[in-house]
Regions:
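Short amphipathic alpha-helical interaction segments
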Residues: 248, 252-256, 276-280, 297-301
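"…together with the soluble PPM/PP2C metallo-phosphatase catalytic core" -> "…together
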Residues: 2-257
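Final/C-terminal transmembrane alpha-helix of multipass membrane proteins
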Residues: 297-318
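A short, structure-level motif marking secondary-structure boundaries and short turns
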Residues: 16-19, 144-145, 269-271, 314-315, ...
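Cytosolic, membrane-interface loops and tails of multi-pass inner-membrane proteins
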Residues: 30-53, 99-101, 263-294
């Protein structure tokens, strides 16, 4: 970080870092969006054609801005440095798919997500224990590292993909991600967890706010897989660092239901020939727009309100 000389108060450096991350994200997106690939419109999405022609893949801008801000202003050790690299790797897999004339296959993307998830699990276990804390109920349990690694891979892979599937309405996945990671930030402080990654949460949140400045309805550009996949892995790492990974089920509840329901529905139909929720369009944000006739703004606000209520209740339970 730039404060290696100790010449400045850490709180001042942190304050400047937050302003820097937001400002540079806004400026970079304004100047560089013309160089991004153009969206082709999602054929099967509700109002997918409205996105056609918009710059896509803006995740590459706000993710690189976040990483630069983290290196300059956060207390980055080797573990956090590796996480930053993995976030960039996941972002790049999404960006190259965004920029490709022919979209990458589902199996290729799923395999790359799996590889990244395995690396996250190995790195986390190298620097941390295999103890799972129960932040709400109290107590903890130590499980064999191999089992912990398997659960971590599932968590990371699932987080990447449900977050990616939730990216279909202007401002939705970005807003939900901010609520999720800020809930994790509050829980970290309640639990007394103060490390370099805790501050990285704030930097990532303000970079997302800089992106949302342009992505609010009607959006001028889209984050693409470059943004959604990076958000997914960031959420997973952030919740792992709380030491209570099961909190993911609550702090990311709306993302899980919105994006995960479609994944489950597709997997059951494709591999087991079981057709569930025949009258429900997935992701759920498309069902809300198509079947319930919600506007984009209503989807974002109502989904956000639901997650905020769950998050507030979760924080309260952790504090008890």
């Amino acid at each position: 970080m730039i404060n290696f000389t100790g010449a400045f108060d850490l709180s001042i450096v942190a304050f400047i870092g937050i302003l820097f991350a937001f400002a540079i994200t806004c400026i970079a997106i304004a100047r560089l969006n013309q160089y991004l690939p153009k969206d082709m419109g999602r054929k099967f999405a509700h109002d997918g054609k409205l996105s056609a022609g918009k710059p896509r893949g803006a995740g590459i801008i706000f993710v690189f801005t976040f990483v630069i801000a983290a290196v300059l202003f956060a207390q980055v050790n080797l573990e956090i440095g590796i996480y930053l690299c993995l976030i960039v790797v996941e972002m790049l897999t999404g960006y190259f798919d965004d920029a490709a004339e022919k979209p990458w296959g589902e199996y290729l993307k799923g395999f790359l997500d799996f590889v990244v998830a395995v690396v996250v699990a190995v790195v986390y276990l190298h620097y941390n224990s295999s103890v799972i804390n129960f932040a709400i109920f109290g107590g903890s349990v130590t499980i064999p590292p191999v089992f912990f690694a398997i659960l971590t891979v599932i968590l990371v892979w699932a987080s990447i993909n449900v977050t990616n599937c939730s990216d279909g309405v202007d401002g939705l996945s970005g807003t939900l991600t901010i609520i999720t990671i800020m809930t994790i930030f509050v829980i970290d402080n309640v639990l007394g967890i103060q490390d370099g990654f805790n501050y990285c949460i704030l930097l990532f949140a303000v970079c997302l706010l800089g992106y949302l400045w342009y992505n609010a309805t009607p959006s001028k550009l889209l984050m693409g897989d470059a943004g959604s996949r990076a958000m997914g892995i960031f959420i997973a790492i952030a919740v792992l660092k709380t030491g209570s990974p099961l909190l993911y089920l609550l702090v990311a509840a709306v993302l899980i239901v919105d994006g995960g329901l479609g994944l489950i529905k597709l997997a059951l139909l494709r591999y087991l020939k079981i057709h569930i929720l025949k009258n429900t369009t997935t992701p759920l944000h498309d069902h809300a727009r198509k079947k319930m006739e919600w506007s984009n703004a209503q989807v974002v606000f109502r989904f956000a309100i639901i997650q905020i209520v769950i998050s507030v209740a979760t924080v309260y339970l952790v504090m008890m």
